[in-house]
């Protein structure tokens, strides 16, 4: 999604963009790319294949966003003189580029050694967000919405690969507090597991499949529960009251950093929720009953992520092109 967000900004400025990837293996991602009229070329893997493809396409610049490529690919393309930008997470994973973008919280505090001549854009000022997020960003922090049963929206990526949905619904049910929840379940097995959760009086859960209307569902909700990760920045930009679940144990540090900002609530680590939902219920219960606290969290997130990250990144890329072409 972050590459798609930057692509949208580049297209907005008049650039022609092509994705080189195996998007057909993830249908919802393929739909997102092609639905914007962006061309797709099949993925290639070796340095020689990349140089041949980039020459055939007549590229002016390349943007990398990959954990799988051999470091030799990055080095060979940069050595060819083609201006390059790489989106990275912490360690560069072998990525060599003229511009390195690390949009992770706290990354601006790190001082890694850079490739010769490279610059680094780090922190939430460079978060890359899609049009559908920016179009729905409120002009002001959301005001408290009191009265009525709170509306909850829960989603965990395109596939919910770790099966978080049923356990989050168990935690919500364990609060005993009335709510109306919309939960995304990408498969029948997950949907059945969610439907099997015993609910208390006044609690209602609707299960749907993957949707392209995530942002609209977010802004229509009083509480959004999602996996801690890059989608968190979308929630904060939209002024959502965000409850985060750490779905992978080795991501606890990033999860804790985000919660420590005061702009989101930590629902818990998924392995803990699976063992016992009571701790998560103790977090969610008060939040469901306190519109003022939900509004405070929403305002903090709205201020933390201003939605202009892709503009700043594109500015640097076009400045690079102006110097090198």
Regions found by a protein language model. Name each.
Residues 306-325:
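C-terminal alpha-helical cap of glycosyltransferases
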Residues 293-307:
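A short, well-ordered alpha-helix in the C-terminal region of glycosyltransferases
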Residues 2-11, 20-116, 120:
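Active-site and donor-binding regions of nucleotide-sugar-utilizing enzymes
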Residues 138-222:
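Donor-nucleotide binding loops and adjacent catalytic segments primarily
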Residues 96-163, 184, 191:
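A nucleotide-sugar donor-handling region in carbohydrate enzymes
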Residues 215, 232-238, 256:
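Short alpha-helical segment that forms part of, or immediately flanks, the ligand-binding pocket
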Residues 219-230, 240:
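Acidic donor-binding loop of glycosyltransferase active sites
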């Amino acid at each position: 999604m972050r590459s798609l967000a930057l692509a949208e900004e580049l297209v907005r400025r008049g650039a022609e963009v092509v994705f080189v990837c195996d998007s057909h293996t993830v249908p919802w991602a393929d739909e997102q790319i092609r639905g914007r009229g962006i061309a797709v070329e099949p993925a290639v893997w070796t340095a020689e294949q990349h140089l041949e493809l980039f020459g055939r396409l007549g590229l002016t610049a390349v943007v990398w966003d990959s954990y799988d490529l051999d470091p030799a690919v990055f080095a060979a393309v940069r050595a060819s003189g083609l201006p390059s930008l790489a989106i990275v997470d912490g360690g560069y994973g072998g990525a060599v580029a003229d511009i390195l973008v690390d949009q992770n919280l706290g990354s601006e505090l790190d001082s890694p050694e850079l490739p010769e001549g490279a610059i680094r854009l780090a922190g939430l000022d460079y978060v890359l967000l899609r049009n559908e997020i920016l179009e729905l960003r409120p002009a002001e922090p959301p005001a408290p919405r009191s009265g009525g049963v709170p509306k909850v929206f829960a989603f965990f990526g395109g596939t919910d690969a770790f099966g978080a949905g049923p356990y989050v619904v168990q935690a919500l049910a364990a609060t005993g507090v009335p709510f109306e929840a919309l939960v995304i379940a990408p498969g029948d097995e997950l949907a059945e597991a969610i439907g099997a959760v015993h609910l208390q009086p006044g609690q209602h859960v609707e299960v749907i499949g993957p949707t392209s209307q995530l942002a609209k569902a977010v802004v229509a909700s009083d509480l959004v529960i999602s996996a801690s990760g890059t989608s968190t920045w979308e929630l904060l930009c939209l002024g959502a009251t965000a409850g985060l679940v750490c779905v992978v144990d080795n991501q606890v540090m990033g999860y804790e950093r985000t919660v420590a900002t005061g702009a989101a609530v930590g629902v818990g680590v998924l392995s803990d929720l699976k063992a016992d939902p009571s701790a998560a219920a103790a977090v969610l219960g008060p939040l469901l009953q306190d519109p003022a606290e939900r509004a405070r969290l929403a305002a903090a997130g709205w201020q933390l992520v201003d939605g202009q990250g892709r503009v700043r990144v594109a500015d640097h890329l076009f400045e690079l092109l102006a110097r090198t072409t």
